[in-house]
């Protein structure tokens, strides 16, 4: 299941790329900018700003899951079925109710990917799998990567690597570049902020490096979590000394995804303001350069 295909991307690997976003993630990062990607199933998004006062179409279409409330709709999400999702989106005249998640075959996705092959060839671009976590759907990920390789298309995967190694290993021959998150090297803060296990990520990174795969490390910098010199040094040291990568990207925290939490009726448990730490960003770049890495800041 996917939730988006983005063509003409220039920020998810080299050149012009098509990014396929797969649903499902094994982490629960507090700052996640794509909360609609976490579940492997479809999600219902509700935008109260588009809801028409006095309209009862959705409540009539699915009275067991929709109730009118003072400030819009009360949705009993735990009761939603695929049939409800279809009925609700079909009846809503303003698209206040929309569904995130679509089942597509490898052939359907590749039809879209192949349309832009001339642009990939000219720019050094290709296909990027993102998410969510692409390796939460290992068979689909491998099929798309293999089909792209057979078509002569460069492949990249944006991944948190918080999955069993057996989900990753079969796809290795078909992956040209890993855009790998390295959020923290210490297990306690990693667990607190992502509900995950840092050791699993570090172990998978070491295995990728041992396999000779090209890796670009990506570091989201979040105040209160890892936006400090000690954490930045530890992450950079691991990337340089343990993985021997050549490139690291620092991604300052932003709040562009907050509205998605409202649409999903989810709490937002991350800082409410973007990271404002120019001195830290300067330090991160300078320290990475001292360690022999090419460092880039990405917004």
UniProtKB/Swiss-Prot annotation:
GO MF annotation terms: 4 iron, 4 sulfur cluster binding; [formate-C-acetyltransferase]-activating enzyme activity; metal ion binding
Main subcellular location: cytoplasm
Entry's EC annotation: 1.97.1.4
Essential cofactor(s): [4Fe-4S] cluster
Localization in the cell: Cytoplasm
A cellular component term, taken from the record's GO annotations: cytoplasm
Highest taxon of source: Bacteria
Pfam families: Fer4_12, Radical_SAM
Cofactor binding note from Swiss-Prot or TrEMBL: Binds 1 [4Fe-4S] cluster. The cluster is coordinated with 3 cysteines and an exchangeable S-adenosyl-L-methionine.
Top-level EC class: oxidoreductase
UniProt domain Radical SAM core: residue ranges: 11-290
Catalyzed reactions per annotation: glycyl-[formate C-acetyltransferase] + reduced [flavodoxin] + S-adenosyl-L-methionine = glycin-2-yl radical-[formate C-acetyltransferase] + semiquinone [flavodoxin] + 5'-deoxyadenosine + L-methionine + H(+)
Alphabetized UniProt keyword annotations: 4Fe-4S, Cytoplasm, Iron, Iron-sulfur, Metal-binding, Oxidoreductase, S-adenosyl-L-methionine
Binding site for S-adenosyl-L-methionine: 31-33, 132, 181-183, 254
InterPro entries, alphabetized: Aldolase_TIM, Organic_radical-activating, Organic_radical_activase, Pyruvate_for-lyase_activase, Radical_activat_CS, rSAM
Sites where the protein binds [4Fe-4S] cluster: 25, 29, 32
PROSITE patterns: RADICAL_ACTIVATING, RADICAL_SAM
Similarity-based family: Belongs to the organic radical-activating enzymes family.
Job of this protein: Activation of pyruvate formate-lyase 2 under anaerobic conditions by generation of an organic free radical, using S-adenosylmethionine and reduced flavodoxin as cosubstrates to produce 5'-deoxy-adenosine.
Name of the protein in question: Putative pyruvate formate-lyase 3-activating enzyme
The encoding gene: ybiY
